[in-house]
Amino acid sequence: MTLWVLGLNHQTAPVDLRERAAFAGDALPRALESLRALPQVSEAALLSTCNRTELYAMADEAHSLVNWLETHAPGLSGHLYQHREAEAVRHLFRVATGLDSMVLGEPQILGQVKDAWAVARAHGALGSGLDRLFQQTFSVAKRARTDTRVGANPVSVASTAVRLAQDSFARLNESTVLLIGAGETIELAAKHLSEGRVRRLLIANRTLAHAQTLASQHGGFALPLTDLERHLAEADVVFSATAAREPLVTRAQVEQALRTRKRKPMLLFDLAVPRDIEASVGELGDAYLYTVDDLERAVEDNRRGRREAADQAEAIIDLQVARYVETLQATARQAPLKRLRAFGDSTRDELLAKARQQLHNGKPADEVLEQLAHALTNRLLHPPTAALRNAALNNDLELTTAADRLFPEKPGYQHPPIATPIVRTDDADPAP
């Protein structure tokens, strides 16, 4: 099986395509079950955020994975990137560290990667290969953030949106802000808004208790989602980030809110994928709509400022990828030896048990030992003998040369011992 990653993100696909590719809520476990049903796939995990959808899999080939994604959301293939083996490892390390994010070094992505791992594990989609990869990913991301400043003064999509709102409304502290949702992105927005203070903070969510908890933490007022339309006109600024499959805020609702506000401008930030606010709202004269794609341009300065720290993090990742691949290769080299030893042990145990039974039945010991020796020799030498016979017929010089080294003609000759590979398990840099 080969390690593959296939995906699309904010760099390769626009928001309308990303929202079609997203897996939200109950769709994620069902998708994992569907993936694991493919005969070419032994392990799988799905990472789905507002900026990316990625499929990690141990699979025979990538074609079946592309077809599966195309079935989920037709039209993706022209926007997909694909990595295998070492490059797939590097990609996941970079994603979890925040080096592949719209906001360079953003801290939320590591939690989202952990969530993807936890869901895949809970639904039986992970095996030892992907589980080991994700565990190493968490370790590498932690080290990169600890040893560099790539995560210093963390900037998120939510904080970038709040900063834009502050720049747009000189007196945001005199404005009413409406938050739709109660997930991590909205929690971050509420935190940044409460630090800068706003006149009134409204929080609407499908589960009222979640909105009430968030409101109590940040001095806001909780609303059931069913009251959203009634309170929309009160909002000068709207932030929305839910997992809804259909828009929660329509053009007609915003038009009505603007009439009620006597055309006083509204600023709306749609931080969700799929989108929470109908795209046509941005066509209204007094409504200013920003999506996650629009925010990419706003965070470019942040990306430049973190480039030096990112370069340091890339160096850490390069080293850790090399070590991880070295460990996998060492394990793979040991596999044939383990199979050979297991074959020898099982053959010995089987024939020895048979010989003991013969002795127990009164058969002469010399006869039993003679039969045991012949049977053991024949059983152990049959596979290599058959393989060498086929190699001679097919002119397989590689195998016959290896046999010459294993079984030299000169009696008593011994090859030098084969050194056991040293597999590094610590994170320390190699000694100079």
Swiss-Prot record:
EC number assigned by the record: 1.2.1.70
Chemical reaction(s) catalysed: (S)-4-amino-5-oxopentanoate + tRNA(Glu) + NADP(+) = L-glutamyl-tRNA(Glu) + NADPH + H(+)
Entry binding sites for NADP(+): 181-186
GO biological process terms, semicolon-separated: protoporphyrinogen IX biosynthetic process from glutamate
Pathway: Porphyrin-containing compound metabolism; protoporphyrin-IX biosynthesis; 5-aminolevulinate from L-glutamyl-tRNA(Glu): step 1/2
Residues the record marks as active site: 50 (nucleophile)
EC top class named in words: oxidoreductase
Keyword NADP in record: yes
Residues holding substrate: 49-52, 101, 106-108, 112
Pfam families referenced in this protein's UniProt entry, alphabetically: GlutR_dimer, GlutR_N, Shikimate_DH
PROSITE patterns, alphabetized: GLUTR
Alphabetized UniProt keyword annotations: NADP, Oxidoreductase, Porphyrin biosynthesis
UniProt-annotated site: Important for activity, residues: 91
SUPFAM superfamilies noted in UniProt: Glutamyl tRNA-reductase catalytic, N-terminal domain, Glutamyl tRNA-reductase dimerization domain, NAD(P)-binding Rossmann-fold domains
Location of region: Disordered: 409-432
UniProt-recorded Gene Ontology molecular function terms: glutamyl-tRNA reductase activity; NADP binding
Protein family (similarity comment): Belongs to the glutamyl-tRNA reductase family.
Quaternary data: Homodimer.
PANTHER family hit by this protein: GLUTAMYL-TRNA REDUCTASE
Function: Catalyzes the NADPH-dependent reduction of glutamyl-tRNA(Glu) to glutamate 1-semialdehyde (GSA).
Note: During catalysis, the active site Cys acts as a nucleophile attacking the alpha-carbonyl group of tRNA-bound glutamate with the formation of a thioester intermediate between enzyme and glutamate, and the concomitant release of tRNA(Glu). The thioester intermediate is finally reduced by direct hydride transfer from NADPH, to form the product GSA.
Note on domains (UniProt): Possesses an unusual extended V-shaped dimeric structure with each monomer consisting of three distinct domains arranged along a curved 'spinal' alpha-helix. The N-terminal catalytic domain specifically recognizes the glutamate moiety of the substrate. The second domain is the NADPH-binding domain, and the third C-terminal domain is responsible for dimerization.
Protein name: Glutamyl-tRNA reductase
Gene: hemA
